[in-house]
Each structure stands twice: as structure tokens, then as C-alpha cells.
Amino acid sequence: MSEKDFVQVAKLGKTVGLKGYVKLHNLSDFSSQFKKDATFFIKNTKEMLKIKHYNANNSTVLFENYEDIEKAKELTNLILFQSIEKSRQTCKLKKDEFFYFDILECEVFEEDKRLGKVVDILETGASYLFEIQSDEKWVEKKYPKIFFIPYLGKFVKNIDIEKRQIFCTQDAFLILENS
């Protein structure tokens, strides 16, 4: 598996207490994946960490073989990764919900006009913004290289993950024009 087959799910913080617990900063929308016996990869290593105990109330986690404070300090600031395949199995989506990794690189259209492709997703509190890298033909016409479309029904009509396409309303091109 290559690096593109994995997704960041958490960052580990400082130790908490004396028994080896560390603060877990969830980088995903799925806290349910952090449970006893769940395993995660550490970037640039083949080492896997297995959860011995997870406390959802204070977002602390204890990993097997790191059950004392000195050993647990080695985990501070590490990023945990999960395979995309395992994420699909363990993280259940509701209707009209999508994984970030499925949205990224999708082409964005308004009717038959290709506006660009999604290069990032920003959380703005109550909603999300798709960061769109404009299609080269729009850049050549002096439109911005980057613009943002809110992930709201007013702007996004349909997302087709299998075709890697997002279809927008007429307001999407207005956003590009006025960015």
C-alpha cells in the first residue's frame, strides 16, 4: 500500500496522568473508530498502535505496550493513520455524506462547464467549503486560480463519487467570476 491509501485520523498530544494515557486530538468526524483493540499506523513506519483503552469523556487513549508515562511520552505529537479501506468498513456514513478522501480531486461542473477540481475542504463551523482549483481555461481568461464553493444545497446539486464529479447550480460560476 502506498501513502495515498491512508488517511490521517488523529494526532496524539501530551501524556495525561501516570499510567501511559495520552491526549487524542481527533482529526476525523468519526470518534467511534477509537475503541478497544482498534489499530492505527504511525506515519513513515510499519509500526501499528493498538488501543488498550479509550476514554471518550476526556479524549485520552492508552495503547498496548505504552502503559507507563515514560514510554507514552514517545507518542507525543505523532499522527495516527488508518487505511482508506478500513475507514470505509468502520466509519458508517449517513445519506448524502461523503468521506473527504472521496471528495478531493473530484471535478466540479456547472451544467456542461468544467469549473475545476476540489483540492481541499475547509470546515467553517456549521458547514464546509470546497476549495476549487480553477480549470486552466478559466485561468487563461484571467479568472482566479482558486475559489471556494460552500457545501450547501444552494450551490451543490449532486455529488457522483463513482464518476468523481460534483454538479453545481448556476451560482457556482458566479462565485468563480466574483472571486
From Swiss-Prot:
Binds ribosomal protein uS19. An accessory protein needed during the final step in the assembly of 30S ribosomal subunit, possibly for assembly of the head region. Essential for efficient processing of 16S rRNA. May be needed both before and after RbfA during the maturation of 16S rRNA. It has affinity for free ribosomal 30S subunits but not for 70S ribosomes. Keywords: Chaperone, Cytoplasm, Ribosome biogenesis, rRNA processing. HAMAP family: Ribosome_mat_RimM. This is Ribosome maturation factor RimM. GO terms for molecular function: ribosome binding. Pfam families: PRC, RimM. Belongs to the RimM family. GO terms for cellular component: cytoplasm; ribosome. It is found in: Cytoplasm. The PRC barrel domain binds ribosomal protein uS19. It comes from the Bacteria. SUPFAM superfamilies: PRC-barrel domain, Translation proteins. Its main location: cytoplasm. One of its GO terms (biological process) is ribosomal small subunit biogenesis. Residues 95-174 form the PRC barrel domain.
